[in-house]
């Protein structure tokens, strides 16, 4: 879709992006799919659509139907959600807000090079899509929690994640585990922030995710 179509249908972008990824995956349907943050929500959408042999959502954004909203998540997303004009533009993030939301396990000095490398103006639209999904008909992040045919799905949570805390991952896991006969699993990594894929010790998270995806098991898998 061109930019004009995106402006005309601002609430469809997430689903259109997922459709594009789906087309790319069609010729490689039997793949392990992993995603972080909103990428975790996209993993759920793709598995729900029949793609993948296993999926791992790492500190994933909530899909429609997940209501957990801890204070730290409100604080981390407020700089974008406070302005109703932000769905229509990219919103920069300050060093202070970045440190709180993503790199809170680091000092401000340690966070600075991470900010310089990775911080870019964020799409306000995608945060509004996620933040208001539960009151949006046909929301872009809608999935069928009762899909018995989807591939196994693991939710990984970071115990010190401010922007998408363990409560979000736990509720998402429980809704899937209760309603679907497909394999659903949950693993908490205590003390890890939203920057879990980049901070020290990331190898343990990556190794666990891959080991699980190669031999999925259901349930609360504890913490490590």
Name the predicted role of every residue range.
Residues 93-128:
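Conserved alpha/beta-hydrolase catalytic His-Asp/Glu region
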Residues 149, 155-157, 161:
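Short beta-strand/loop motif that positions the catalytic acidic residue
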Residues 123-145:
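Active-site nucleophile elbow and catalytic-triad environment of alpha/beta-hydrolase enzymes
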Residues 32-66:
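Conserved hydrolase catalytic core segment
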Residues 53-88, 128-135:
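Flexible "cap/lid" loop of the alpha/beta hydrolase fold
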Residues 162-171:
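Conserved alpha/beta-hydrolase "acid-adjacent" motif
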Residues 16-31:
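Conserved acidic catalytic loop of the alpha/beta-hydrolase fold
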Residues 179, 183-224:
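Catalytic active-site module of serine/aspartate enzymes centered on a nucleophile-bearing elbow/loop
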């Amino acid at each position: 879709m061109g930019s004009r179509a995106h402006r005309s249908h601002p609430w469809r972008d997430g689903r259109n992006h997922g459709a594009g990824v789906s087309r790319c995956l069609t010729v490689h349907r039997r793949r392990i799919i992993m995603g972080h943050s909103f990428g975790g929500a996209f993993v759920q959408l793709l598995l729900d659509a029949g793609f993948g042999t296993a999926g791992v959502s790492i500190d994933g954004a909530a899909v429609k139907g997940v209501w957990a909203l801890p204070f730290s998540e409100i604080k981390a997303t407020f700089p974008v959600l406070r302005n109703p004009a932000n769905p229509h533009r990219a919103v920069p993030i300050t060093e202070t807000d970045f440190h709180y939301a993503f790199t809170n396990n680091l000092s401000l000095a340690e966070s600075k090079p991470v900010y310089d490398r990775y911080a870019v103006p964020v799409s306000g639209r995608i945060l509004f899509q996620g933040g208001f999904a539960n009151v949006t008909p046909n929301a872009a992040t809608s999935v069928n929690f009762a899909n018995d045919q989807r591939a196994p799905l693991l939710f990984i949570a970071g115990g010190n994640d401010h922007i998408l805390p363990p409560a979000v991952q736990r509720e998402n896991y429980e809704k899937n585990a209760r309603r679907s006969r497909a394999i659903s699993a949950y693993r908490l990594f205590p003390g890890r922030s939203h920057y879990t894929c980049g901070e020290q010790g990331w190898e343990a998270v990556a190794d666990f995710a891959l080991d699980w995806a190669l031999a999925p098991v259901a349930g609360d898998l504890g913490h490590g």
